[in-house]
């Protein structure tokens, strides 16, 4: 019995050591990426105070399940951070089950709370990735598409992790914002893709998932 307990203790200590090393590596990588990120969006939320915006917006959300009676793995939230900033969150959990829906809903809920406390999207997404990766569940991951519309300057900012491309339609033109980054919690190496696009009156933004 003592030998078995000793082996279990040794195994637990080794696992803790590996997790601690992973945590340190993750934090170092996150700090490096934040230091080298685009300075024009690092303090975006903090820079915008309440005021009368120059532009107005309207939105429509459409969802459809793959099979009749199945549960969508997608979750989304659209909300105002200030009078000048509108946030859009879309997450796609793995599969078409209640669990996948719960995971994506948890992701967008946490992300909204981070942003409400003026935590920058890239920092929040790295934190969410660490939390999911640290749980060590191979089948637990979700995409995350974060968008912010600046109603004062007429700009669209996006941060993407494993999600589909975003399309901006302007009359006969279509602008595509691609994404090639991994989902949150899926792989040890994680990074966030960021983009900015100038907007004009009557532009339409399509933020989609693959279902």
Where are these regions (language model features)?
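Signal-transmission coiled-coils
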Residues: 1-55, 87
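Catalytic core of PPM/PP2C metal-dependent serine/threonine phosphatase domains
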Residues: 36, 43-49, 53, 101-171
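N-terminal entry segment of metal-dependent catalytic domains or homologous docking segments
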Residues: 38-94, 99, 105-109, 166, ...
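Short, solvent-exposed secondary-structure boundary motifs
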Residues: 64-70, 134-138, 185-189
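Acidic loop->beta-strand submotif enriched in PP2C/PPM serine/threonine phosphatases
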Residues: 72-82, 144, 177-211
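Short hydrophobic-aromatic micro-motifs
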Residues: 86-89, 158, 205-208
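DG-centered beta-turn motif at the end of beta-strands
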Residues: 92, 163, 207-211
């Amino acid at each position: 019995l003592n030998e078995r307990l000793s082996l279990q203790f040794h195994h637990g200590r080794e696992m803790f050591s590996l997790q601690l090393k992973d945590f340190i590596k993750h934090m170092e990588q996150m700090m490096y990426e934040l230091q080298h990120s685009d300075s024009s969006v690092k303090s975006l939320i903090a820079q915008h105070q309440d005021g009368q915006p120059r532009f107005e917006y309207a939105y429509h959300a459409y969802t459809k399940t793959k099979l009749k009676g199945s549960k969508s793995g997608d979750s989304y939230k659209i909300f105002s951070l200030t009078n000048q900033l509108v946030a859009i969150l879309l997450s796609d959990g793995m599969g078409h089950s209640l669990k996948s829906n719960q995971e994506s809903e948890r992701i967008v809920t946490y992300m909204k709370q981070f942003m409400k406390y003026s935590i920058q999207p890239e920092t929040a997404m790295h934190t969410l990735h660490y939390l999911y990766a640290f749980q060590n569940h191979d089948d637990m991951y979700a995409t995350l598409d974060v968008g912010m519309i600046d109603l004062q300057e007429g700009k669209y900012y996006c941060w993407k992790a494993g999600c589909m491309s975003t399309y901006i339609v302007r009359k006969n033109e279509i602008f595509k914002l691609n994404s090639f980054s991994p989902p949150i919690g899926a792989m040890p190496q994680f990074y966030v893709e960021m983009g900015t696009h100038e907007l004009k009156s009557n532009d339409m933004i399509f933020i989609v998932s693959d279902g």
